[in-house]
Curated annotation (Swiss-Prot):
Located on the platform of the 30S subunit, it bridges several disparate RNA helices of the 16S rRNA. Forms part of the Shine-Dalgarno cleft in the 70S ribosome. It comes from the Bacteria. SUPFAM superfamilies: Translational machinery components (SSF53137). It comes from Herminiimonas arsenicoxydans. Pfam families: Ribosomal_S11. GO terms for biological process: translation. Part of the 30S ribosomal subunit. Interacts with proteins S7 and S18. Binds to IF-3. GO terms for molecular function: rRNA binding; structural constituent of ribosome. Gene3D superfamilies: Ribosomal protein S11. This is Small ribosomal subunit protein uS11. The keyword Ribosomal protein applies. Keywords: Ribonucleoprotein, Ribosomal protein, RNA-binding, rRNA-binding. Belongs to the universal ribosomal protein uS11 family.
Length: 134
């Protein structure tokens, strides 16, 4: 005999709570292969995020400044819906999407209050991988 459908599963689905935050931090991780943009509030809780690969770019096109720009626009639009007006930008990594992603956030109308470079630099720690020979 078949059981009646359980409505408890439908009751567990919650509506997404919309946060209203005026200031936040944009973490931009620009590697040589991809660019990841995460916009958080001051406490570090993620409001929105986007990547070059998630924006539809694959392979070597992910590592272009244009792909980083598209990803930054996608993350910025969701952040604006959360009420973000001012952003502090923290850039990590040597990738080609560093500058273009900051410009894209600025062009969306978000005021950028501070730009920090938080790229980790070793104080002569681990030995780096050997040079690539082509």
């Amino acid at each position: 005999m078949a059981k009646a459908p359980n409505n408890a599963a439908a009751a567990r689905v919650r509506k997404k709570v919309k946060k209203n935050v005026a200031e936040g931090i944009a973490h931009i991780h620009a590697s040589f292969n991809n660019t990841i943009i995460t916009i958080t509030d001051r406490q570090g809780n993620a409001l929105s995020w986007a990547t070059s690969g998630g924006a539809g770019f694959k392979g070597s096109r992910k590592s272009t400044p244009f792909a980083a720009q598209v990803a930054a626009e996608a993350a910025g639009k969701v952040a604006i819906e959360c009420g973000i007006k001012n952003l502090e930008v923290r850039i990590k990594g040597p990738g080609p999407g560093r500058e273009s992603s900051v410009r894209a956030l600025n062009n969306l109308g978000i005021k950028i209050t501070q730009i920090q470079d938080v790229t980790p630099v070793p104080h002569n720690g681990c030995r780096p991988p050997k040079r690539r020979r082509i």
